[in-house]
Amino acid sequence: MKFENANVLITGGASGIGKIMGRMALEKGAKCFIIWDINLAGIEAARKELGRFGKVKGYVVDVSNYEVVNLAYIKAVEDCGEIDIVINCAGIITSNKTFDLMSADEMTRTMNINTLAPMFVTRAMLPDMLQRDHGHVCNITSAGGMLSNPRMSVYAASKWGAIGWSDSVRIELQNMKSRVHFTTVAPYFINTGMFNGVKSPIIPVLKPEYVAKRIIKAIERNKSFRGIPFGFHFIRFWQFILPTRIFDWFFGEVMGIYHAMDEFTGRKSDAIKASKAS
């Protein structure tokens, strides 16, 4: 899918890799970068920062609210025209609590934003894409959606759900012989602030620019799935062939992944939102 002359909508686009991908899309000739975010100040700052690259429109949208999403979609189309590329990038992790300490509100908020929100956004736009037989949906999930990890059980569940949904819709479109494409992206921890305090002794925490560049390239090439780094493509293979105790020993003790969240602090804004929801 080409970015040139495309209207590109990115949820969570006011910061992190969402904002970086928006800039990259404009650099590649996108007609308009449409930001959906809940942070008005962040939206305005991103518009000022990226305005020199091209047209940027921003809307305050709670993507976990289906009615709000539908109204915001209608407004975006009125202002910018049909959406060609949507990147579901909004996400949250509330804490590093073990599951027995997680509140029902934390569970609900995590599942709503990480799993249901990309479904809501895509459901609003997909019928029009199918009618035009044109468009691309990219869902940013997580390597945590393929690899179980202590102290992030609900986050992992939300991303497992997102991966299963995203890839299932991809196959539905394939069976329809549609030209609308789906890309599922599963990156490792990214150094954007969302995973402050994470420790990863073997696999380095990923740089946002690197991840954004890989995602943009995956969309351009209509890739079905992209693990970042590439080695994460093989996680499921090793899970199937290795005994569980060997798999746990390697990823938990050798790679240190099962202890990555032990000192997690996260982004203060996410913690505040979680406490307000509790």
Residue ranges and their predicted role:
Residues K2-I34:
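Canonical Rossmann dinucleotide-binding motif of NAD(H)/NADP(H)-dependent dehydrogenases/reductases
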Residues A30-A45:
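Conserved glycine-rich Rossmann-like NAD(P)H-binding loop of the short-chain dehydrogenase/reductase
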Residues L40-A41, V60-L71, A104:
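The beta1-alpha1 cofactor-binding region of Rossmann-like NAD(H)/NADP(H)-dependent oxidoreductases
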Residues K97-F99, S103-R109:
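Substrate-binding pocket helix/loop in short-chain dehydrogenase/reductase
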Residues T122, S158:
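Active-site helix of classical SDR
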Residues S142:
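Residue(s) in the substrate-gating loop at a strand-loop-helix junction
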Residues T184, S200-R236:
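C-terminal helical subdomain
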